[in-house]
Protein backbone atom coordinates (compact mmCIF):
# COMPACT_ATOMS: atom_id res chain seq x y z
CA UNK A 1 0.00 0.00 0.00
CA UNK A 2 1.29 3.46 -0.93
CA UNK A 3 -0.16 6.50 0.84
CA UNK A 4 0.42 10.04 -0.39
CA UNK A 5 0.28 13.12 1.88
CA UNK A 6 -3.13 14.75 2.18
CA UNK A 7 -3.47 18.14 0.55
CA UNK A 8 -6.58 19.23 2.48
CA UNK A 9 -8.20 18.98 5.90
CA UNK A 10 -10.61 16.20 6.88
CA UNK A 11 -14.21 17.26 7.37
CA UNK A 12 -16.60 14.33 7.21
CA UNK A 13 -18.83 11.88 9.03
CA UNK A 14 -17.74 8.24 8.82
CA UNK A 15 -20.57 5.75 9.28
CA UNK A 16 -18.97 2.66 7.73
CA UNK A 17 -16.23 1.88 10.27
CA UNK A 18 -15.73 -1.87 10.52
CA UNK A 19 -18.10 -3.62 12.93
CA UNK A 20 -16.59 -4.51 16.29
CA UNK A 21 -14.33 -7.53 16.00
CA UNK A 22 -14.54 -8.65 19.64
CA UNK A 23 -18.34 -8.52 19.67
CA UNK A 24 -18.61 -10.26 16.28
CA UNK A 25 -16.43 -13.19 17.40
CA UNK A 26 -18.57 -13.62 20.50
CA UNK A 27 -21.87 -13.37 18.61
CA UNK A 28 -20.87 -16.31 16.44
CA UNK A 29 -19.50 -18.43 19.30
CA UNK A 30 -22.19 -17.63 21.86
CA UNK A 31 -24.97 -18.53 19.44
CA UNK A 32 -23.96 -22.12 20.27
CA UNK A 33 -25.07 -21.54 23.89
CA UNK A 34 -28.74 -21.31 22.90
CA UNK A 35 -31.23 -23.75 21.39
CA UNK A 36 -32.91 -21.10 19.24
CA UNK A 37 -31.67 -19.04 16.27
CA UNK A 38 -29.60 -15.94 17.01
CA UNK A 39 -29.97 -12.92 14.74
CA UNK A 40 -26.91 -10.74 14.22
CA UNK A 41 -26.88 -7.51 12.21
CA UNK A 42 -23.75 -5.61 11.15
CA UNK A 43 -21.56 -8.68 11.72
CA UNK A 44 -17.94 -7.98 10.77
CA UNK A 45 -17.36 -9.62 7.40
CA UNK A 46 -13.58 -9.77 7.63
CA UNK A 47 -11.13 -12.64 7.41
CA UNK A 48 -10.85 -13.41 11.13
CA UNK A 49 -14.54 -13.22 11.97
CA UNK A 50 -15.61 -15.12 8.86
CA UNK A 51 -13.26 -17.90 9.98
CA UNK A 52 -15.04 -17.94 13.34
CA UNK A 53 -18.40 -18.19 11.59
CA UNK A 54 -17.07 -21.10 9.51
CA UNK A 55 -15.91 -22.90 12.67
CA UNK A 56 -19.36 -22.47 14.24
CA UNK A 57 -20.82 -24.03 11.09
CA UNK A 58 -18.38 -26.96 11.30
CA UNK A 59 -19.52 -27.48 14.90
CA UNK A 60 -23.05 -28.08 13.63
CA UNK A 61 -24.72 -24.67 13.34
CA UNK A 62 -26.73 -23.61 10.30
CA UNK A 63 -25.69 -20.21 8.94
CA UNK A 64 -28.03 -18.04 6.87
CA UNK A 65 -26.67 -14.73 5.57
CA UNK A 66 -29.14 -12.57 3.68
CA UNK A 67 -26.89 -9.52 3.65
CA UNK A 68 -28.93 -7.55 6.17
CA UNK A 69 -28.43 -10.05 8.99
CA UNK A 70 -26.87 -13.38 9.80
CA UNK A 71 -29.14 -16.01 11.36
CA UNK A 72 -27.28 -18.71 13.29
CA UNK A 73 -29.31 -21.79 14.21
CA UNK A 74 -27.37 -23.85 16.77
CA UNK A 75 -27.20 -27.64 16.76
CA UNK A 76 -28.90 -29.61 19.53
CA UNK A 77 -25.40 -30.66 20.55
CA UNK A 78 -22.01 -29.39 19.39
CA UNK A 79 -20.73 -31.98 16.96
CA UNK A 80 -17.25 -33.35 16.47
CA UNK A 81 -15.94 -31.92 13.16
CA UNK A 82 -14.19 -34.03 10.55
CA UNK A 83 -11.65 -31.34 9.70
CA UNK A 84 -9.26 -28.92 11.37
CA UNK A 85 -10.84 -25.74 12.77
CA UNK A 86 -8.91 -22.92 11.10
CA UNK A 87 -8.74 -19.67 13.10
CA UNK A 88 -6.69 -17.76 10.51
CA UNK A 89 -4.91 -14.85 12.17
CA UNK A 90 -7.16 -14.53 15.23
CA UNK A 91 -5.82 -15.14 18.73
CA UNK A 92 -9.23 -14.26 20.16
CA UNK A 93 -10.93 -17.01 18.16
CA UNK A 94 -8.36 -19.66 19.04
CA UNK A 95 -8.24 -18.85 22.75
CA UNK A 96 -11.99 -18.59 23.26
CA UNK A 97 -12.65 -21.78 21.28
CA UNK A 98 -10.10 -23.53 23.52
CA UNK A 99 -12.34 -22.83 26.49
CA UNK A 100 -15.62 -23.54 24.72
CA UNK A 101 -14.44 -26.86 23.26
CA UNK A 102 -12.51 -28.05 26.33
CA UNK A 103 -15.81 -29.03 28.00
CA UNK A 104 -17.53 -30.55 24.94
CA UNK A 105 -17.90 -34.22 24.08
CA UNK A 106 -15.54 -34.81 21.17
CA UNK A 107 -12.11 -34.32 19.64
CA UNK A 108 -11.16 -30.97 18.11
CA UNK A 109 -8.06 -29.53 16.42
CA UNK A 110 -7.48 -25.77 16.31
CA UNK A 111 -4.93 -24.22 13.97
CA UNK A 112 -4.18 -20.91 12.26
CA UNK A 113 -1.80 -19.17 9.90
CA UNK A 114 1.96 -19.15 10.55
CA UNK A 115 1.70 -15.97 12.62
CA UNK A 116 -1.04 -17.30 14.90
CA UNK A 117 0.62 -20.69 15.29
CA UNK A 118 3.72 -18.96 16.64
CA UNK A 119 1.80 -17.04 19.32
CA UNK A 120 1.67 -18.28 22.96
CA UNK A 121 -1.33 -20.39 23.94
CA UNK A 122 -0.06 -21.84 27.24
CA UNK A 123 -1.71 -18.97 29.15
CA UNK A 124 -5.01 -20.61 28.19
CA UNK A 125 -4.02 -24.27 27.91
CA UNK A 126 -2.17 -24.44 31.25
CA UNK A 127 -5.01 -23.23 33.51
CA UNK A 128 -7.57 -25.24 31.55
CA UNK A 129 -5.44 -28.39 31.87
CA UNK A 130 -4.99 -27.72 35.59
CA UNK A 131 -8.79 -27.68 35.90
CA UNK A 132 -9.06 -31.02 34.12
CA UNK A 133 -9.01 -30.21 30.40
CA UNK A 134 -7.11 -32.33 27.89
CA UNK A 135 -5.31 -29.92 25.57
CA UNK A 136 -2.03 -30.74 23.83
CA UNK A 137 0.16 -29.13 21.21
CA UNK A 138 3.72 -28.17 20.37
CA UNK A 139 5.97 -26.86 23.15
CA UNK A 140 3.73 -28.17 25.94
CA UNK A 141 0.57 -26.81 24.31
CA UNK A 142 2.06 -23.35 23.89
CA UNK A 143 1.70 -23.37 20.12
CA UNK A 144 -0.98 -24.48 17.68
CA UNK A 145 -2.03 -26.75 16.14
CA UNK A 146 -3.77 -27.70 19.38
CA UNK A 147 -5.62 -30.96 20.03
CA UNK A 148 -8.53 -30.89 22.45
CA UNK A 149 -10.28 -33.93 23.91
CA UNK A 150 -13.39 -32.54 25.57
CA UNK A 151 -14.19 -33.41 29.17
CA UNK A 152 -16.29 -32.07 32.06
CA UNK A 153 -14.58 -30.24 34.94
CA UNK A 154 -15.27 -29.96 38.63
CA UNK A 155 -16.18 -26.50 39.93
CA UNK A 156 -13.00 -24.43 40.19
CA UNK A 157 -11.58 -21.13 41.40
CA UNK A 158 -8.91 -19.29 39.43
CA UNK A 159 -6.93 -16.21 40.43
CA UNK A 160 -5.49 -14.76 37.23
CA UNK A 161 -2.17 -12.95 37.55
CA UNK A 162 -2.78 -10.98 34.36
CA UNK A 163 -5.73 -8.88 33.21
CA UNK A 164 -6.71 -10.77 30.07
CA UNK A 165 -10.17 -10.92 28.55
CA UNK A 166 -9.11 -13.98 26.58
CA UNK A 167 -7.98 -15.97 29.63
CA UNK A 168 -11.12 -14.92 31.49
CA UNK A 169 -13.46 -15.73 28.60
CA UNK A 170 -11.92 -19.14 27.92
CA UNK A 171 -12.25 -20.22 31.55
CA UNK A 172 -15.79 -18.87 31.86
CA UNK A 173 -16.92 -20.74 28.74
CA UNK A 174 -15.39 -23.98 30.01
CA UNK A 175 -17.01 -23.50 33.42
CA UNK A 176 -20.38 -22.70 31.88
CA UNK A 177 -20.50 -26.17 30.34
CA UNK A 178 -19.14 -27.85 33.48
CA UNK A 179 -19.83 -26.96 37.11
CA UNK A 180 -19.25 -23.24 37.29
CA UNK A 181 -16.36 -21.25 38.73
CA UNK A 182 -15.06 -18.26 40.61
CA UNK A 183 -12.64 -16.11 38.62
CA UNK A 184 -10.66 -13.11 39.83
CA UNK A 185 -8.36 -10.74 37.95
CA UNK A 186 -5.89 -8.05 39.08
CA UNK A 187 -7.74 -5.31 37.19
CA UNK A 188 -10.82 -5.17 35.03
CA UNK A 189 -10.15 -6.48 31.52
CA UNK A 190 -12.54 -6.18 28.58
CA UNK A 191 -15.90 -7.36 29.87
CA UNK A 192 -17.81 -8.19 26.67
CA UNK A 193 -18.09 -11.87 27.63
CA UNK A 194 -19.71 -11.16 31.01
CA UNK A 195 -22.08 -8.59 29.54
CA UNK A 196 -23.20 -10.83 26.70
CA UNK A 197 -23.60 -13.93 28.89
CA UNK A 198 -25.67 -11.92 31.38
CA UNK A 199 -27.80 -10.56 28.54
CA UNK A 200 -28.44 -14.13 27.37
CA UNK A 201 -29.58 -15.18 30.85
CA UNK A 202 -26.49 -16.82 32.33
CA UNK A 203 -26.22 -16.82 36.13
CA UNK A 204 -23.14 -14.62 36.35
CA UNK A 205 -22.30 -12.03 39.00
CA UNK A 206 -19.42 -9.61 39.43
CA UNK A 207 -18.18 -8.32 42.79
CA UNK A 208 -15.47 -5.79 41.92
CA UNK A 209 -12.70 -7.98 40.44
CA UNK A 210 -14.30 -11.37 41.19
CA UNK A 211 -16.76 -13.15 38.93
CA UNK A 212 -19.00 -16.00 40.04
CA UNK A 213 -20.50 -18.12 37.26
CA UNK A 214 -22.99 -20.93 37.78
CA UNK A 215 -23.18 -23.81 35.28
CA UNK A 216 -25.61 -23.67 32.38
CA UNK A 217 -28.56 -25.88 33.42
CA UNK A 218 -30.55 -25.12 30.27
CA UNK A 219 -29.81 -23.35 26.97
CA UNK A 220 -29.41 -19.58 27.13
CA UNK A 221 -31.61 -17.10 25.28
CA UNK A 222 -30.60 -16.41 21.68
CA UNK A 223 -28.91 -13.19 20.64
CA UNK A 224 -30.77 -10.45 18.81
CA UNK A 225 -28.11 -7.81 18.30
CA UNK A 226 -26.87 -4.98 16.12
CA UNK A 227 -23.08 -5.14 16.38
CA UNK A 228 -21.72 -1.62 17.02
CA UNK A 229 -18.74 -0.29 15.10
CA UNK A 230 -15.28 -1.01 16.43
CA UNK A 231 -13.65 1.71 18.58
CA UNK A 232 -10.23 0.21 17.88
CA UNK A 233 -10.82 0.55 14.12
CA UNK A 234 -12.32 4.03 14.55
CA UNK A 235 -9.25 5.09 16.54
CA UNK A 236 -7.09 5.26 13.41
CA UNK A 237 -9.33 8.01 12.02
CA UNK A 238 -9.51 9.79 15.37
CA UNK A 239 -5.72 10.08 15.26
CA UNK A 240 -5.92 11.28 11.65
CA UNK A 241 -8.29 14.10 12.65
CA UNK A 242 -5.97 15.15 15.48
CA UNK A 243 -2.84 15.43 13.34
CA UNK A 244 -4.19 16.82 10.03
CA UNK A 245 -4.67 20.62 10.33
CA UNK A 246 -8.21 22.01 10.56
CA UNK A 247 -9.87 18.58 10.53
CA UNK A 248 -13.20 17.58 12.07
CA UNK A 249 -14.46 13.99 11.99
CA UNK A 250 -17.56 12.34 13.44
CA UNK A 251 -17.36 8.57 13.91
CA UNK A 252 -20.83 7.01 14.00
CA UNK A 253 -22.33 4.10 15.95
CA UNK A 254 -19.19 3.26 17.93
CA UNK A 255 -18.99 0.86 20.89
CA UNK A 256 -18.40 3.02 23.99
CA UNK A 257 -17.63 0.34 26.58
CA UNK A 258 -15.22 1.96 29.05
CA UNK A 259 -12.75 -0.91 28.66
CA UNK A 260 -12.53 -0.10 24.94
CA UNK A 261 -12.14 3.69 24.83
CA UNK A 262 -9.16 4.15 27.16
CA UNK A 263 -6.93 5.16 24.23
CA UNK A 264 -9.31 8.05 23.52
CA UNK A 265 -9.05 9.06 27.19
CA UNK A 266 -5.26 9.12 26.81
CA UNK A 267 -5.62 11.42 23.81
CA UNK A 268 -7.86 13.71 25.88
CA UNK A 269 -5.16 13.91 28.57
CA UNK A 270 -2.69 14.86 25.82
CA UNK A 271 -4.92 17.81 24.92
CA UNK A 272 -7.11 16.32 22.21
CA UNK A 273 -10.56 17.75 21.57
CA UNK A 274 -12.85 14.70 21.68
CA UNK A 275 -16.57 14.46 22.48
CA UNK A 276 -18.66 11.34 23.10
CA UNK A 277 -22.38 11.33 22.25
CA UNK A 278 -24.14 8.26 23.69
CA UNK A 279 -27.11 7.18 21.56
CA UNK A 280 -28.20 3.72 22.76
CA UNK A 281 -27.53 0.86 25.15
CA UNK A 282 -28.59 -2.80 25.14
CA UNK A 283 -25.80 -5.27 25.67
CA UNK A 284 -23.29 -2.37 25.44
CA UNK A 285 -23.16 1.44 25.38
CA UNK A 286 -23.08 2.79 21.81
CA UNK A 287 -22.70 6.31 20.41
CA UNK A 288 -20.80 8.75 18.22
CA UNK A 289 -17.29 10.14 18.71
CA UNK A 290 -16.44 13.65 17.51
CA UNK A 291 -12.77 14.58 17.03
CA UNK A 292 -11.20 17.91 16.01
CA UNK A 293 -7.68 18.87 14.99
CA UNK A 294 -5.63 19.45 18.12
CA UNK A 295 -2.33 21.22 17.32
CA UNK A 296 -1.11 21.33 20.92
CA UNK A 297 -0.92 17.64 21.77
CA UNK A 298 1.60 17.18 24.56
CA UNK A 299 3.62 14.17 25.64
CA UNK A 300 2.28 11.82 28.30
CA UNK A 301 3.26 8.83 30.44
CA UNK A 302 0.87 5.87 30.25
CA UNK A 303 1.19 2.91 32.62
CA UNK A 304 -2.35 2.07 33.82
CA UNK A 305 -5.30 0.22 32.28
CA UNK A 306 -3.00 -1.06 29.55
CA UNK A 307 -5.26 -4.01 28.76
CA UNK A 308 -7.93 -1.45 27.81
CA UNK A 309 -5.77 0.09 25.08
CA UNK A 310 -3.48 -2.74 23.99
CA UNK A 311 -4.94 -2.91 20.47
CA UNK A 312 -4.64 0.85 19.97
CA UNK A 313 -0.99 1.05 21.08
CA UNK A 314 0.51 1.23 17.54
CA UNK A 315 -1.87 4.04 16.54
CA UNK A 316 -1.29 5.73 19.89
CA UNK A 317 2.42 5.68 19.02
CA UNK A 318 1.61 7.73 15.92
CA UNK A 319 -0.13 10.33 18.11
CA UNK A 320 2.92 10.32 20.42
CA UNK A 321 5.19 10.96 17.42
CA UNK A 322 3.08 13.98 16.43
CA UNK A 323 2.89 15.44 19.96
CA UNK A 324 5.20 17.97 21.59
CA UNK A 325 7.66 16.47 24.03
CA UNK A 326 8.25 12.94 25.25
CA UNK A 327 5.68 10.17 25.65
CA UNK A 328 6.24 6.89 27.45
CA UNK A 329 4.19 3.68 27.47
CA UNK A 330 4.99 0.97 30.05
CA UNK A 331 3.43 -2.21 31.50
CA UNK A 332 2.66 -3.26 27.93
CA UNK A 333 4.81 -6.37 27.55
CA UNK A 334 1.78 -8.10 26.02
CA UNK A 335 2.57 -6.14 22.84
CA UNK A 336 5.56 -8.45 22.32
CA UNK A 337 3.28 -11.43 21.60
CA UNK A 338 0.54 -9.94 19.43
CA UNK A 339 0.32 -10.52 15.66
CA UNK A 340 3.89 -9.21 15.64
CA UNK A 341 6.26 -7.93 18.31
CA UNK A 342 4.42 -4.61 18.24
CA UNK A 343 7.00 -2.85 20.40
CA UNK A 344 9.94 -3.70 18.13
CA UNK A 345 8.04 -3.32 14.85
CA UNK A 346 6.46 0.02 15.81
CA UNK A 347 9.71 1.54 17.05
CA UNK A 348 11.77 0.31 14.09
CA UNK A 349 9.21 1.73 11.67
CA UNK A 350 9.11 5.09 13.49
CA UNK A 351 12.91 5.28 13.36
CA UNK A 352 12.75 4.67 9.61
CA UNK A 353 10.40 7.67 9.46
CA UNK A 354 12.96 9.82 11.27
CA UNK A 355 11.15 9.82 14.62
CA UNK A 356 13.20 9.75 17.83
CA UNK A 357 11.93 6.55 19.45
CA UNK A 358 13.31 3.73 21.58
CA UNK A 359 12.18 0.37 22.93
CA UNK A 360 11.62 -0.58 26.54
CA UNK A 361 11.18 -4.19 27.61
CA UNK A 362 7.52 -3.47 28.35
CA UNK A 363 6.80 -0.48 26.11
CA UNK A 364 8.45 2.43 24.37
CA UNK A 365 9.58 6.06 24.58
CA UNK A 366 8.75 8.43 21.74
CA UNK A 367 9.87 12.04 21.37
CA UNK A 368 7.68 14.15 19.14
CA UNK A 369 9.44 14.56 15.79
CA UNK A 370 8.80 15.58 12.20
CA UNK A 371 8.12 12.31 10.35
CA UNK A 372 9.27 11.69 6.78
CA UNK A 373 8.36 9.25 4.01
CA UNK A 374 9.61 5.69 4.48
CA UNK A 375 8.98 2.16 3.29
CA UNK A 376 8.02 0.10 6.33
CA UNK A 377 7.40 -3.61 6.85
CA UNK A 378 4.16 -4.32 8.74
CA UNK A 379 5.34 -7.89 9.47
CA UNK A 380 1.87 -9.08 8.52
CA UNK A 381 0.28 -7.11 11.39
CA UNK A 382 -2.93 -5.35 10.38
CA UNK A 383 -2.75 -2.74 13.15
CA UNK A 384 0.83 -1.78 12.30
CA UNK A 385 -0.15 -1.37 8.64
CA UNK A 386 -3.16 0.82 9.42
CA UNK A 387 -1.30 2.94 11.98
CA UNK A 388 1.43 3.85 9.53
CA UNK A 389 -1.12 4.48 6.81
CA UNK A 390 -2.46 7.23 9.09
CA UNK A 391 1.02 8.69 9.57
CA UNK A 392 1.32 8.52 5.79
CA UNK A 393 -1.47 11.08 5.51
CA UNK A 394 1.08 13.60 6.83
CA UNK A 395 4.32 12.49 5.21
CA UNK A 396 3.55 9.71 2.74
CA UNK A 397 4.23 6.01 3.36
CA UNK A 398 4.92 2.73 1.57
CA UNK A 399 3.61 -0.22 3.62
CA UNK A 400 4.65 -3.79 2.88
CA UNK A 401 2.33 -6.74 3.65
CA UNK A 402 -0.70 -4.46 3.87
CA UNK A 403 -2.99 -7.26 2.67
CA UNK A 404 -3.38 -8.33 6.32
CA UNK A 405 -5.57 -5.26 6.89
CA UNK A 406 -8.40 -7.36 5.47
CA UNK A 407 -8.35 -9.62 8.55
CA UNK A 408 -10.11 -6.89 10.57
CA UNK A 409 -10.99 -3.90 8.36
CA UNK A 410 -11.68 -4.78 4.70
CA UNK A 411 -12.88 -1.29 3.73
CA UNK A 412 -10.04 0.63 5.41
CA UNK A 413 -8.50 1.81 2.13
CA UNK A 414 -11.92 2.83 0.80
CA UNK A 415 -12.49 5.09 3.81
CA UNK A 416 -9.05 6.65 3.29
CA UNK A 417 -10.03 7.42 -0.29
CA UNK A 418 -13.36 8.87 0.84
CA UNK A 419 -11.36 11.16 3.13
CA UNK A 420 -9.53 12.46 0.07
CA UNK A 421 -6.35 10.43 0.40
CA UNK A 422 -4.50 9.15 -2.64
CA UNK A 423 -4.01 5.44 -2.02
CA UNK A 424 -2.43 2.79 -4.20
CA UNK A 425 -3.72 -0.34 -2.53
CA UNK A 426 -3.04 -3.26 -4.85
CA UNK A 427 -2.27 -5.42 -1.78
CA UNK A 428 -5.68 -4.68 -0.25
UniProtKB/Swiss-Prot annotation:
Gene3D superfamilies named in the record: Enolpyruvate transferase domain
Which GO BP terms sit in this record? amino acid biosynthetic process; aromatic amino acid family biosynthetic process; chorismate biosynthetic process
The main location class comes to cytoplasm
Q: Name one GO molecular function term.
A: 3-phosphoshikimate 1-carboxyvinyltransferase activity
Biochemical pathway: Metabolic intermediate biosynthesis; chorismate biosynthesis; chorismate from D-erythrose 4-phosphate and phosphoenolpyruvate: step 6/7
Record's subcellular location? Cytoplasm
InterPro entries the UniProt entry points to: Enolpyruvate_Tfrase_dom (IPR001986), Enolpyruvate_Tfrase_sf (IPR036968), EPSP_synthase (IPR006264), EPSP_synthase_CS (IPR023193), RNA3'P_cycl/enolpyr_Trfase_a/b (IPR013792)
What PROSITE patterns does this protein map onto? EPSP_SYNTHASE_1, EPSP_SYNTHASE_2
The UniProt annotation places phosphoenolpyruvate binding at 21, 91, 119, 166, 342, 383
Keyword annotations for this protein, in alphabetical order, are: Amino-acid biosynthesis, Aromatic amino acid biosynthesis, Cytoplasm, Transferase
Task: Report whether Cell membrane shows up as a keyword of the record.
Answer: no
UniProt EC number:
2.5.1.19
Q: Which GO terms describe its cellular component?
A: cytoplasm
| Similarity field | Belongs to the EPSP synthase family.
> How does the annotation summarize its subunit structure?
Monomer.
**Protein name as catalogued:** 3-phosphoshikimate 1-carboxyvinyltransferase
What organism is the protein native to?
A: Campylobacter concisus (strain 13826)
Gene of this entry: aroA
Amino acid sequence: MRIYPLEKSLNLTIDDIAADKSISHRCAMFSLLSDKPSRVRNYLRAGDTLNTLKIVELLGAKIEDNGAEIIITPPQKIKEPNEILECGNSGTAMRLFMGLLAAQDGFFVLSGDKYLNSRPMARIAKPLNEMGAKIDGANNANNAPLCIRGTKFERFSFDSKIASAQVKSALLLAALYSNGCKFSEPELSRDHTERMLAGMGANIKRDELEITLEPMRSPLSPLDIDVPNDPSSAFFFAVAALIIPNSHIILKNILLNKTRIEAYRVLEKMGAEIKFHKTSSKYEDIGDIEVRYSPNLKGIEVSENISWLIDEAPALAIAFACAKGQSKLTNAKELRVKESDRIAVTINALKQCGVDASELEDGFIINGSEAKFATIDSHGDHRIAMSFAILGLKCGMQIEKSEFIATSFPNFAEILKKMGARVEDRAC
